[in-house]
Amino acid sequence: MPKKSIVTGASRGIGLAIARELAARGSDVVLISRGGCPEQAEAIAKEFGVKTFTFACDVSSSDSVKDAFKQAIDALGGVDCLVNNAGITRDGLVLRMKDEDFDNVIATDLRSTFLCTRAVLRTMMGARYGRIVNIASLNGIRTQAGQANYAAAKAGVIGMTKSNSMEFGSRGITVNAVAPGFIDTDMTAAMSEETRAKYAAQIPLARLGKPEDVAKAVAFLASDDAQYITGQVIGVDGGLNA
């Protein structure tokens, strides 16, 4: 298992569950979020007995990423695992979608994956070891109307995952993606019970996923058990894409 992990979008939901799962398996963790999340970091450190740090970062900004990741790598004394989880949605029909809604989703969901990966790469290459796990989405594989920006961003994350796996493999760095389906997060909690039931009825396992389901898949890909797995997209969707 990695011992020095960085997780973006870690203040809540899937990102927080990933940070907790990595900590539970013995990794020190840096939690990256737009405003920092000291309460969550402190709670993880207390529960699992690992070192945690948190830094505020706009993951769509090159300068912000460079600054935050330098602090993160210095605090950890290196980095052997990066989880690119930060993301937003701004759904809307193309005819009505504002330029900024398209641009902001691409910047936060796709550009950030490039920026954060680049920020850890020199350290991982020097160590000839690294685990990079990108959080994509079922919507990057099998999408729906009204998500042109989000679907494009997540499909891009999948393409970047595959390209980077080929580029970094000779340096001992694996790059994989996890593609969650309908996960029970703050976003889905805001849906009506009728809508949630409608989504659940489409899923072979007959329930929405939990953030912990995604976190366990990430932890597997970060572990030595997955040392010969790279360039892959693991669906965590209850069979929705079967």
Which functions belong to the PLM regions below?
Residues L93-V94, K98-I106, Y199:
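Substrate-binding pocket helix/loop in short-chain dehydrogenase/reductase
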Residues S137:
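Residue(s) in the substrate-gating loop at a strand-loop-helix junction
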